[in-house]
Regions:
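Alpha-helical membrane-targeting segments
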Residues: 1-26, 80-88
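Soluble catalytic domains of membrane acyltransferases
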Residues: 25-153
Length: 153
């Protein structure tokens, strides 16, 4: 059984504010160069996982470009040690377990609602940003077979 996202109004509100404020402390400037347009579809954000900043920066991009309800897939063992993240939109995946199928079904369900953004880091673990080869875990793309509507990626 997976741990589903349970947005709590205060934790989610705080996370959104914190994700907007925190990068400004450590980065001189954040510039989004994009010609991406919001098509009004649910959004799937896929990225390489190179730092603990990734989730915050994904929410920062979400706020600037899409302003959807944030959901992020996390390894269950990491989520269990930081359960407050569940209240900000984190849900679990357990690598190598049959419950992965349930996680993919849940992700597809989230992507059925155009008000949602789903963030995933298919590398599984944090890797150096200097790695020249980015390798995603196998199977994550099967989730898309379960999505019945168009999705913006």
């Amino acid at each position: 059984m997976i741990i589903k996202a349970r947005h709590h109004w205060f934790f989610y509100w705080f996370f959104r504010k914190y994700s907007n404020w925190l990068p400004r402390l450590d980065f001189r400037e954040i510039v989004l160069h994009t010609q991406l347009e919001d098509k009004g579809l649910p959004v799937l954000m896929i990225g390489n996982h190179f730092s603990w900043w990734d989730g915050f920066l994904a929410e920062y991009v979400n706020r600037r470009l899409f302003d959807r309800k944030y959901h992020v897939m996390m390894l269950e063992e990491q989520l269990r040690t930081r359960m407050f993240l569940n209240k900000t939109g984190a849900y679990s995946i357990r690598k190598g377990d049959r419950s992965m199928l349930e996680t993919f079904r849940y992700s597809a369900e989230l992507l059925g609602d155009p008000r949602n953004v789903v963030v995933m880091f298919p590398q599984g673990l944090i890797h150096s940003q200097h790695d020249h080869q980015i390798v995603f875990e196998r199977g994550w793309y099967r989730m898309m077979d379960k999505v019945e509507n168009p999705v913006q990626m």
